[in-house]
Amino acid sequence: AYAEALGVDIDQLILSQPNTGEEGLQIADTLISSGAIDIVVVDSVAVLVPRAEIEGEMGDSHVGLQARLMSQALRKLSGTIAKTKTIAIFINQIREKVGVMFGN
């Protein structure tokens, strides 16, 4: 309803809520490679959690996993994006203070 009020044609909207970062980026790659879409928005990069982190134990160290996942994905996607002329938007969050929302 809100998207429609903003002018989004929801019949043309593809919404995906993947379980892992790898799954989400694979879906983006598949859609971009198909040439059937004009724009893909990943919201948010912060929740593209690597499979190893999801399957690991609480407290395990996963230093750099998300950075490596994004680096690899962007290297792979950049060529496909250029060929298909698809617009790709990646939204992320910056948190300076844990627990603070909306600039408070």
From Swiss-Prot:
Belongs to the RecA family. It comes from Lactobacillus delbrueckii subsp. bulgaricus. It is found in: Cytoplasm. GO terms for cellular component: cytosol. This is Protein RecA. One of its GO terms (biological process) is SOS response. The lineage of its organism: Bacteria, Bacillati, Bacillota, Bacilli, Lactobacillales. PANTHER family: MITOCHONDRIAL DNA REPAIR PROTEIN RECA HOMOLOG-RELATED, RECA. One of its GO terms (molecular function) is ATP binding. Its main location: cytoplasm. Can catalyze the hydrolysis of ATP in the presence of single-stranded DNA, the ATP-dependent uptake of single-stranded DNA by duplex DNA, and the ATP-dependent hybridization of homologous single-stranded DNAs. It interacts with LexA causing its activation and leading to its autocatalytic cleavage. It comes from the Bacteria. Keywords: ATP-binding, Cytoplasm, DNA damage, DNA recombination, DNA repair, DNA-binding, Nucleotide-binding, SOS response. The keyword Transferase does not apply. InterPro entries: DNA_recomb/repair_RecA, P-loop_NTPase, RecA-like_N, RecA_ATP-bd.
